[in-house]
UniProtKB/Swiss-Prot annotation:
Belongs to the chorion protein S15/S18 family. Keywords: Secreted, Signal. The gene is Cp18. This is Chorion protein S18. Residues 1-17 form the signal peptide.
Length: 166
């Protein structure tokens, strides 16, 4: 629907273009050229424009005296004589920014809901050190990232990487 409306407006603009005020070099025939006007995206890019004073801090902060930089909206098309948009170097970044703006929300983060696991622990069996309790009762088993960290630390202790007993 939006594309249809935009094409409709462009067609009307092309048909109703007049020769009034179009004096000078490089004149275009009546109705020969129509520009598609789109609202600027909310993404902006900091573009260095040369000169002295300014920098990224606006003359007050970091980069004073190293040239001016302006914040411009990201446009779909950049031409050397236009003052709108960014250089073609940022074309990939522009595509990614448009995709991120147009992408639907993914919702909340994916969470793996595991049931709580209670393990009965007895005092029998090999003991790894005096720091570990005898283990009568029940403990809750680690889940997710905690389980990975716990298993890696246990693997390290089994391979002889544990600290001295102090």
């Amino acid at each position: 629907m939006m594309k249809f409306m935009c094409l409709f407006v462009c067609a009307i603009a092309a048909v109703s273009a007049s020769d009034y005020g179009n004096v000078g070099y490089g004149r275009v025939p009546v109705g020969g050229l129509a520009y598609q006007v789109q609202p600027a995206l909310t993404v902006s890019s900091i573009v260095p424009v040369g000169g002295y004073g300014g920098g990224y801090g606006g003359g007050r902060g970091y980069g004073r005296g190293y040239g001016r930089s302006v914040e411009v909206p990201v446009a779909a098309v950049w031409t050397p004589n236009s003052r709108y948009g960014v250089a073609p170097v940022d074309r990939q970044a522009l595509g990614l920014a448009k995709l991120s703006l147009a992408a639907p929300g993914a919702g909340g983060p994916l969470v793996l809901n595991e049931p709580r696991r209670i393990i009965k622990v007895s005092g029998y069996g090999p003991q790894r050190g005096y720091k570990q309790p005898l283990g009568y009762g029940s403990i809750e088993q680690a889940q997710g990232a905690s389980a990975a960290a716990a298993s890696s630390s246990v693997a390290g202790q089994n391979k002889g990487y544990q600290n001295g007993g102090y």
